Amino acid sequence: MNRRTGVKAAALAAAGALLLSACSTSTTGSDAGGDGSALTVGTTDKVVALDPAGAYDNGSSLVEQQIYPFILAYKPGTAELNPSIAESADFTEPTKYEVKLKDGLKYANGNDLTSSDVKFSFDRQLKIQDPNGPSSLLGGLASVETPDDTTVVFNLKRENDQTWPGVLASAAGPIVDEDVFSPDALTPDQEIVDAEAFSGPYTIDSFKFNELITYKAYPDYQGYVEPAKTDSVQMRYYSDANNMKLDVQKGTIDVAWRSLSATDIEDLGKDENLTVHKGPGGEIRYIVYNMDTMPFGAKTDDPDEKKALAVRQAMADSIDRQAIASQVYKDTYTPLYSFVPDGLPGANEALKSAYGDGQGGADVEKAKKALEDAGVQTPVDLNLQYNPDHYGPSSGDEYALIKDQLDKTGLFNVNLQSTEWVQYSEDRTSDVYPMYQLGWFPDYSDADNYLVPFFYDTDETPSFLANHFRDDQINKELTDQASTADKAEREKELGTIQDQLSEQLPTLPLLQGNQIAVSGKDVKGVEETLDPAFQFRLALLSK
């Protein structure tokens, strides 16, 4: 015990003194489950899959947060992590992170939840490595041991991994029922629902894929988030944000949560029966380049790395982010000039000085020179894909303006196309789109989460982008920063990585935005869940 205590203290000091102890709030049996009036929440976010191994998107993550147990959870209103189904969670050695589970954990189907389920959950993520899944977050995990039914030891590749507690509360962290889920393939949605493989604040009572989910409070929930204040919550999925706007105005739904247009938000803010809630911003929007299929990409008929880079650089020189933020989003978004959003430790504005006029604006002559110096004939044909439903109704206007900005330079001829989200998710990882829109909502509040999933790429841990960008030096630096205990030194390392990425431009960051929800005046709890953890907790809502 003395050895354990001493090592734990040293490790936690190195990890920023994150203290995770059994003093967290927990709930059991008869205390759980609210009796508030039923609520209906609307969203345009689509669900890709209920299986956590096959989904790494905002719509699917929202569902996971309601129905699955996590080892750690964020305290509402903060980015502070606490044990959830764990009694405790700490480093016992620099590369060993030990979790003690609470006794008597069960899934809604009656199956015991033990350390075996925890090991199973992480092992299957790494084995399946679905291109739409979050396995890229587990690049720092070497193996999982289970000394007994309530003890889990995570063997980590990096000493004092600064990010591991956040990973446990992320999209890679749901603990699934090993008696229901396949160990080496995705489990179909309906099988999960029929088997009642849930142990979060809610279970799923009924399920119609991307139409309607009815949640029911789980009475035996033992996680950190308080018992659900409302016994029954419906999540209604919209293909058209205008219909969602009309429904929240009429009171057909109680909350509209992602994504309304900036014009709609402005309009709804004038309705005396509604409240517009705003929370901390962590969302980013960006263009992804497929290094194989973009103009002059590695697998095109005319591969040329120098020319491909020049095309990316010239696009960066030609985009006016402020115009997009103001004209399309009425400044509910702000320009993003790096790969990490402003406000996080380590963020810089590497792209602002490197491209365009050096002040954030476009510079067509600079773009023209970049292409000329590389021997690129103009105009360059660009096939640019965007998604009209997942990232909000203004995506069409956003990408129409991007097309207009690029076309007006005379250097590009943009062919703009759109695809709905479920198909889009499959296509983008199958080399269908040479360049395309994506957005990002963080798994945890750290610059690492805007870098590692995108740009750390190995055979064992492919990147989430699947865009064929791989740089061994950046891989090494991403690994090193995660275990750098000195805050100032780590921020310096993060800045260096962003500078290097700005030279290669595997993606083109565009905007960052706030969390916004609209609710009826009688709805409580919305403000509490719009917090730096970026998790929308239905359990906090009531009316």
Q: Across the structure, where does each feature detected by a protein language model lie?
A:
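Detector for C-terminal structural segments
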Residues: G34, K208, L212, A217, ...
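N-terminal lobe/hinge region of extracytoplasmic solute-binding protein
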Residues: G42-E93, D123, A197
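Aromatic- and charge-enriched surface segment that lines or borders ligand/interaction sites
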Residues: S88-P131, P147, V153-N155, D247, ...
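Surface-exposed binding/hinge segments that line
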Residues: D90, S135-F181, S206
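Alpha-helical secondary-structure segments
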Residues: T114-S121, T151-N155, G200-P201, T230-S232, ...
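Gly/Pro-rich hinge or "lid" segments in bacterial periplasmic/extracellular proteins
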Residues: S170-V225, S232
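Ligand-site clamp/hinge motif
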Residues: D220-D267
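Structural transition elements
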Residues: T334-D373, H390-S395
